[in-house]
Amino acid sequence: MAIVGTIIKIIKAIIDIFAK
C-alpha cells in the first residue's frame, strides 16, 4: 500500500500547484 500513499502525495502536490 506504499504505492497508494505515494500516488496520494503526488495528487496532493498537483492540487497544491493548481490551488495557487
UniProtKB/Swiss-Prot annotation:
Domain of life: Bacteria
N-formylmethionine: residues carrying this PTM: 1
GO biological process: killing of cells of another organism
Upregulating conditions: Up-regulated by agr.
InterPro entries xrefs: PSM_alpha (IPR031429)
Protein keywords: Cytolysis, Formylation, Virulence
Misc. remarks from the entry: Peptide production is higher in most prevalent community-associated MRSA strains than in hospital-associated MRSA strains.
UniProt similarity note: Belongs to the phenol-soluble modulin alpha peptides family.
Role description: Peptide which can recruit, activate and subsequently lyse human neutrophils, thus eliminating the main cellular defense against infection. Stimulates the secretion of the chemotactic factor interleukin-8 (IL-8). The ensuing activation process triggers an inflammatory response in the host, thus contributing greatly to virulence. Also possesses hemolytic activity, which may contribute to the development of disease.
Protein name (database record): Phenol-soluble modulin alpha 4 peptide
Species: Staphylococcus aureus (strain MW2)
